[in-house]
Amino acid sequence: MFSSTLARRTAALVQSTGIAKRAFAMGPSSGGAVSDETLEKLGSLSTQALVDGLWVMGWPAAQIDGARPLAPGMKCVGRAVTLNFVPARPDIAQDKPAGGESPEYEAFEKCGPNEVLVMSSTGPWESVGGDIKFLRLKQLSIGGLVTDGSVRDTDEIINYGFPCFSYSTTARQGPAAMQPWECNGIVSLSGTVVRPGDAIIGDQDGVVCVPAKVAEMVYSIAHGREEIEEIVKEELIKNPGPPGKYYPFMSGKVKVDSPLGQLLATKGITPENSNQFEGTADW
């Protein structure tokens, strides 16, 4: 009697307050998709330069902390295809599409050479997969895999040849601890938000997510900064001295008459062709 009465009252409350209409209200998962041309440009830069570019724009943390290359020399560049894991629970295991219809295999099939599979784990030591599952990623020539969790069968995955970045490695299976639940939703890895279509770039220093909506501007800033840093480094090798004469600098605020501004002028970099000077910022 109590449960049926409570159910009726709850239903009435839902209808009267409009909760039913708002329950699934949300914004779009994707903010767009980075073009192949932009991916190539972003991939030509270091992750440090990209992080600096986002920092200059005032955007929040972009590095996926803890995601490290499984082997030296690995580098990944691609559009994010996301997969979210949730803690294991009997009803979730029952309700999740089974077999080949599972969200994880849906995500796999969306991947190719210009995509990076981004897998959000429930913990750094939980396994998101191993050699049998990831054989399919090898067959698809995936651009890379990134997770804030762990992977197993490390040697086999390295031999598959695709770039893999994870928090750690493990011998444990994952299904006992978590279940794949959603493909191409917004995910969070180590506190960094990733949307489907964002640019994912990984190298020896870590993995960075560049939001699709600002990818071109981030490239413009980061490329300009990296160019200046190379000039500064070259000058300090040629004329040894404290780096503080030229470095650090703030993009969009370099003064023409400063030591750095004068050095850049000798290399043909001026406010007319660079957005790094005072008054030239276009972001």
Segments the model singles out, each with a brief description of its role:
Residues M1-P28:
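N-terminal mitochondrial targeting presequence
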Residues A25-P196, C209-W283:
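Feature captures the catalytic cores and cofactor-binding loops of soluble hydro-lyases/lyases
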Residues D203:
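Beta-strand-loop-alpha-helix segment that lines the small-molecule cofactor/substrate pocket
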